[in-house]
């Protein structure tokens, strides 16, 4: 028995139209799949942690406990932790044996070496090319062109949280170069 075209129970699509739809749909799916990573690349990542901050972590990736940290570090010390963006960041122990309100990114502004704290000279000295920074991270001797980047350090619930420093650099009185 022959069916009439245009009846409501039979779709009005031939083989050629179906194959065109299938080909176009597949090509569109592949194109969108390839476009997704490109679009994601241009969208900035969301800040991790609480309120845009990151909890300081030790070398093993564990959260640093302030009470344990202060028991192990003397006043006026600087100790490395994992900070913003996973960069090594110094936690500052103040003269009154409390955590400072800022942390210092330990990456040298000359060539990106990690700058160790020299406690005997009370400054940071880069092992790569000899750049020196005072105890606040301000550059005092080149070839490094800029001071170490700052991060806010706040203590809550026995944890240290680093957040981005966006206001004026207290060491130079200028806008921060790292924002």
Swiss-Prot record:
S-S bridge residues: 113-128
Organism whose genome encodes this protein? Cyanothece sp. (strain PCC 7425 / ATCC 29141)
What Pfam families does the entry give? Rieske (PF00355), TM_PetC (PF25471)
Essential cofactor(s): [2Fe-2S] cluster
Q: Which domain of life is it from?
A: Bacteria
Asked if the keyword Transmembrane belongs to this entry, the reply reads yes
Q: What is its EC number?
A: 7.1.1.6
Q: Which PANTHER family match?
A: CYTOCHROME B-C1 COMPLEX SUBUNIT RIESKE, MITOCHONDRIAL
Which InterPro entries does UniProt cross-reference here? Cyt_b6_f_Rieske (IPR023960), Rieske_2Fe-2S (IPR017941), Rieske_2Fe-2S_sf (IPR036922), Rieske_Fe-S_prot (IPR014349), Rieske_Fe-S_prot_C (IPR005805)
Query: Which family is annotated?
Result: Belongs to the Rieske iron-sulfur protein family.
Q: What residues does the Rieske domain cover?
A: 61-162
Protein's name according to its UniProt entry: Cytochrome b6-f complex iron-sulfur subunit
- Spans traversing the lipid bilayer: 21-43
